[in-house]
Amino acid sequence: MAYSTREILLALCIRDSRVHGNGTLHPVLELAARETPLRLSPEDTVVLRYHVLLEEIIERNSETFTETWNRFITHTEHVDLDFNSVFVEIFHRGDPSLGRALAWMAWCMHACRTLCCNQSTPYYVVDLSVRGMLEASEGLDGWIHQQGGWSTLIEDNIPGSRRFSWTLFLAGLTLSLLVICSYLFISRGRH
């Protein structure tokens, strides 16, 4: 079955919230799941495999993720639109790659984790951020469909395999693009 990027990312954020949260699902994720009924469970094999892959990307690049997120979240009034702006910067030439897609998904999962696990984050910031990342991510659907879907892309990326290591390497390189885009985005000013 072909899943949308929105469905995959939401299932990943819910899965990640269960793994790293305090045992409860953030109300924003509950609402998003009601608004976009999931055709796959956060416990689905595809979600679990992507979660392992993205966790590895986040772990290997934790300083980059933290620094980029801290710069990004300095102003929150239009954070939903800011996600779209960063997405456009990363994929501006219309030439997505698996590395770019995974770096984007890992960054979004990290952002969701950071927001949902911090009890002092205002509800509206979490809401705007989750909505922004889910909506921006829909821009990957055409390319993902051309590649055979999210399920096909993960089939050969089994932890410990050579392809898994190569995918991690490419995603790590792509993170440099994410950092550059966030710096450009911030230095140009917002809106």
Swiss-Prot record:
Gene Ontology biological process terms in this record:
regulation of apoptotic process; symbiont-mediated suppression of host apoptosis; symbiont-mediated suppression of host autophagy
Q: Which residues are glycosylated?
A: 22, 118
**What PROSITE patterns would the database entry show?**
BCL2_FAMILY, BH2
The GO cellular component terms are: host cell membrane; host cell mitochondrion; membrane
The record's subcellular locations are: Host membrane; Host mitochondrion
Q: Give the record's keywords alphabetically.
A: Apoptosis, Early protein, Glycoprotein, Host membrane, Host mitochondrion, Host-virus interaction, Inhibition of host apoptosis by viral BCL2-like protein, Inhibition of host autophagy by virus, Membrane, Modulation of host cell apoptosis by virus, Transmembrane, Transmembrane helix
Q: What is the similarity comment for this entry? A: Belongs to the Bcl-2 family.
Q: How does it assemble?
A: Interacts with isoform 1 of host VRK2; this interaction is involved in protecting cells from apoptosis. Interacts with host PRA1; this interaction seems to modulate BHRF1 anti-apoptotic activity. Interacts with host BCL2L11. Interacts with host BAD and BBC3. Interacts with BALF1; BALF1 acting as a negative regulator of the survival function of BHRF1. Interacts with host BECN1.
State what protein this is by name: Apoptosis regulator BHRF1
Organism, by scientific name, is: Epstein-Barr virus (strain GD1) (HHV-4)
